[in-house]
Amino acid sequence: MAKVPDMFEDLKNCYSENEEVSSSIDHLSLNQKSFYDVSYGPLHEGCMDQSVSLSISEISKTSKLTFKQSMVVVSTNGKVLKKRRLSLSQSITDNNLEAIANDSEEEIIKPRSAPFSFLSNMTYHFIRIIKHEFILNDTLNQTIIRANDQYLTAAAIHNLDEAVKFDMGAYTSSKDDTKVPVILRISKTQLYVSAQDEDQPVLLKEMPEIPKTITGSETNFLFFWETHGTKNYFISVAHPNLFIATKHDNWVCLAKGLPSITDFQILENQA
């Protein structure tokens, strides 16, 4: 009787034969943190405690696939749980992660939690104030105003003197120069916008001066500022899937999108 090929053994042999190649591509190395660096929920009983994560692999010696092309997660019975093809010159980015998560042709392994610790654990250094005394309007032409000493809200107003005026301070990080982290301060005060969890109101917190360095738990004061035409978005650094948002008859909060409004128009020179 013909011997049934052991696919998992082939995978191990392929990796062993190409160990020297893997050392030249550290960002795909098994010595580095896994591309899927999250805690996964329980798999089917037949696969529990049997899955392995390979950063790079060939499927078998006879497959003729090049060593550089694939990234897979397989179980010991040879079932491919998740895969993504990459070239050696392709860096792993947030877009890679998002594309994999949204690809309907791939089997999704849902995590219990997937914190963006690589963002919140960075150190951010203050550069300078880049905008002074601007107003934020949402797409319903509501203006952000003070609800009380601690919270903000949005309302249709006729007198712009009621509007909150913000200053925007820019920060930088040596590890990621593709985003623009900013801090939002109520003009002529030392009150700073601070993020909480989803659907929780943003807070106004007082600090003696603008922080020169922000890291760890203090990243709730930072937001990635993105612009698309006249639309402006403020994405929480502490919660990178949540935006500053307005909601009907509610405080300004953090939200993923509708029914909350996450895009704003910046009105400058309103002093």
From Swiss-Prot:
Entry's Gene Ontology molecular function annotations: copper ion binding; cytokine activity; interleukin-1 receptor binding
Record SMART domains: IL1
Superkingdom, taxonomy of origin: Eukaryota
Any Pfam family matching the protein: IL1_propep
Positions of modified residues (N6-acetyllysine): 82
Glycosylated residues (UniProt): 102, 121, 137, 141
GO biological process, one term: positive regulation of cell division
Gene Ontology terms: cellular component: cytosol; extracellular space; nucleus
Subunit-level organization: Monomer. Interacts with TMED10; the interaction mediates the translocation from the cytoplasm into the ERGIC (endoplasmic reticulum-Golgi intermediate compartment) and thereby secretion. Interacts with IL1R1. Interacts with S100A13; this interaction is the first step in the export of IL1A, followed by direct translocation of this complex across the plasma membrane.
Family the entry assigns: Belongs to the IL-1 family.
Protein's recorded name: Interleukin-1 alpha
Source species: Macaca fascicularis
Lineage per the UniProt record: Eukaryota, Metazoa, Chordata, Craniata, Vertebrata
